[in-house]
């Protein structure tokens, strides 16, 4: 079946935002009287939304047990993190190589593009504006736009419904287990990118439809695999 809709993850797929996120996490920890962590440690905590990132930073590990932290503790820390991240202004966030030109090629080829991220939606428009991508995507969802987020398939299915596209005609593209599972749970083709944030696990171990080490290779594949859109 022809593919009409390409649904992209954001952090770790299109942009590397870890330098800003790490600065905000460490600013939060310092404010709370805790020791900061190296950027490479924080990199492995990114991908499940801001609240989980905050929880991991508070306990200093990727696995957080239920009830390990009081809700009030997380709520306060998350607000401190949000305040710090807002002040960062995205100055250290960069687009991965070939992403800007690749997105424009795909849009010009006739695909509809959507963005589904677990990042809080309040931080997304400013980044899109900075990179000049505000008119690239037909639909944009953040991790708090709906009651559930990836790996739940609901955000992907919601995008399909809004854009009136059969889920079988959509492709989920991302760098982590949350993206691949969301796409698989929505019965979509899934395309993995190996360079992002996947907790140290090779994206190919998740059995995506295809996987790529570079965004330009992904674009070439899409243009050849689904030529009806050209």
From Swiss-Prot:
Keyword Hydrolase belongs to the record: yes
EC top class named in words:
hydrolase
Return the InterPro entries for the record: HAD-like_hydrolase_sf (IPR050155), HAD-like_sf (IPR036412), HAD-SF_hydro_IA (IPR006439), HAD_2 (IPR041492), HAD_sf (IPR023214), PGP-like_dom2 (IPR023198), PGPase_prok (IPR037512)
Spell out the SUPFAM superfamilies in the cross-references: HAD-like (SSF56784)
Q: Which domain of life is it from?
A: Bacteria
| Entry EC no(s) | 3.1.3.18
Q: Which reaction(s) does the protein catalyse, per the Swiss-Prot or TrEMBL entry?
A: 2-phosphoglycolate + H2O = glycolate + phosphate
Q: Please give a single GO biological process term from the UniProt record.
A: carbohydrate metabolic process
- In what pathway does it function? Organic acid metabolism; glycolate biosynthesis; glycolate from 2-phosphoglycolate: step 1/1
Gene3D superfamilies per record: HAD superfamily/HAD-like (3.40.50.1000), Putative phosphatase, domain 2 (1.10.150.240)
Q: What residues does Mg(2+) bind to?
A: 9, 11, 175
Cofactor(s) this protein cannot do without: Mg(2+)
One Pfam match: HAD_2
Catalytic residue positions:
9 (nucleophile)
Which GO cellular component term is one of those annotated? cytosol
Give this protein's Gene Ontology molecular function annotations. Answer: metal ion binding; phosphoglycolate phosphatase activity
Recite the UniProt keywords alphabetically.
Answer: Carbohydrate metabolism, Hydrolase, Magnesium, Metal-binding
NCBIfam families to which the protein is assigned, alphabetical? HAD-SF-IA-v1, HAD-SF-IA-v3, PGP_bact, PRK13222.1-2
**Record's function text:** Specifically catalyzes the dephosphorylation of 2-phosphoglycolate. Is involved in the dissimilation of the intracellular 2-phosphoglycolate formed during the DNA repair of 3'-phosphoglycolate ends, a major class of DNA lesions induced by oxidative stress.
Which family is it part of? Belongs to the HAD-like hydrolase superfamily. CbbY/CbbZ/Gph/YieH family.
- Name of this protein: Phosphoglycolate phosphatase
Q: Source species, please?
A: Psychrobacter arcticus (strain DSM 17307 / VKM B-2377 / 273-4)
């Amino acid at each position: 079946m022809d593919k009409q809709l390409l649904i992209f993850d954001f952090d770790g797929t299109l942009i590397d935002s870890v330098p800003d996120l790490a600065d905000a996490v460490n600013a939060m920890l310092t404010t709370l009287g805790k020791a900061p962590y190296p950027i490479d440690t924080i990199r492995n905590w990114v991908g499940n939304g801001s609240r989980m990132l905050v929880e991991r930073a508070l306990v200093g590990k990727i696995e957080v047990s239920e009830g390990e932290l009081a809700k009030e503790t997380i709520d306060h820390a998350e607000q401190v993190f949000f305040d710090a991240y807002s002040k960062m202004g995205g100055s250290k966030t960069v687009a991965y190589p070939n992403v800007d030109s690749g997105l424009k090629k795909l849009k010009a080829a006739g695909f509809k593009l959507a963005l589904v991220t677990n990042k809080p939606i309040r931080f997304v428009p400013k980044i899109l504006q900075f990179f000049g991508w505000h008119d690239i995507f037909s639909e944009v969802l953040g991790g708090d736009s709906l009651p559930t987020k990836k790996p739940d398939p609901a955000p992907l299915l919601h995008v399909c419904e809004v854009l009136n596209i059969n889920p079988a005609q959509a492709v989920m593209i991302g760098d982590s287990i949350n993206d691949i599972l969301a796409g698989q749970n929505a019965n979509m083709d899934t395309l993995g990118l190996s360079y992002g944030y996947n907790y140290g696990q090779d994206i190919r171990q998740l059995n995506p439809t295809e996987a790529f080490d570079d965004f330009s290779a992904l674009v070439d594949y899409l243009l050849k695999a689904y030529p009806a859109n050209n």
